[in-house]
């Protein structure tokens, strides 16, 4: 089964990418390795206005990965009470409707503040509901993310790691059931 882990920001050395790496390890542990798509790797030419009409070939690896996936696990930070602009732009650049229609999607949110990206995850649920995705109901919110990652970016909170593992395992089962 092909799960895409989408790191929802292009900020260098982001906590989002660190949490995505933790999830990548968790998916490997549960026997379902996931492929990471990092928005920091988006090709610069996707930002040219002509990309709305014709996507550059360098973007194909991103759209192809989403289209070939059985499910997408999206990790998002909270920027100014919302999702990162780059994440919304990425969603807008993907083929419509086939990128997310009937595709399972899970959400993990993280923030420096106390709400753990509750608002951006709820905003994404609206967007993906509109896109007719199958939304996995078990979300994980990571408040005060700077307090649960060590200097190397490793998660040091066993309870939070268990919640991420439970989410990943549940998402794999959710995707399997929807594939039947």
Report each predicted region and the residues it spans.
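Short helix-loop-beta connector
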Residues: 101
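Short amphipathic alpha-helical patches
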Residues: 50, 86-89, 110-118, 131-134, ...
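Short, glycine-/small-residue-rich phosphate/pyrophosphate-handling segment
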Residues: 104-144, 159
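Mobile beta-alpha loop/short-helix "lid" or hinge segments that flank ligand
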Residues: 35-46, 96-98, 131-151
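N-terminal beta1-alpha1-beta2 submodule of the flavodoxin-like/Rossmannoid cofactor-binding fold
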Residues: 1-96, 154-180
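A short, flexible beta-alpha/helix-coil linker loop
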Residues: 9-10, 42-44, 107, 112, ...
């Amino acid at each position: 089964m092909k799960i895409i882990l989408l790191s929802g920001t292009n900020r260098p050395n982001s906590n989002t990418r660190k949490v995505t790496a933790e999830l990548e390890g968790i998916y490997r542990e549960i026997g379902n390795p996931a492929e990471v798509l990092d928005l920091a790797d988006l090709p610069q030419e996707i930002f040219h206005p002509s990309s709305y009409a014709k996507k550059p070939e360098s973007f194909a690896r991103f759209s192809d990965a989403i289209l070939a996936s059985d499910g997408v696990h999206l990790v998002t930070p909270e920027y100014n009470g919302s999702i990162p602009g780059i994440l919304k732009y990425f969603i807008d650049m993907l083929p419509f409707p086939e990128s997310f229609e009937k595709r399972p999607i899970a959400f993990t949110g993280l923030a420096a503040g106390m709400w753990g990206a509750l608002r951006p995850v709820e905003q994404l649920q609206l967007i993906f509901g509109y896109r007719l995705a199958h939304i996995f109901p078990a979300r994980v919110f990571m408040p005060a993310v700077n307090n649960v990652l060590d200097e190397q970016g490793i998660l040091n909170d066993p309870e939070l790691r268990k919640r991420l593992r439970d989410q990943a395992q549940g998402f794999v089962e959710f995707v399997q059931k929807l594939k039947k």
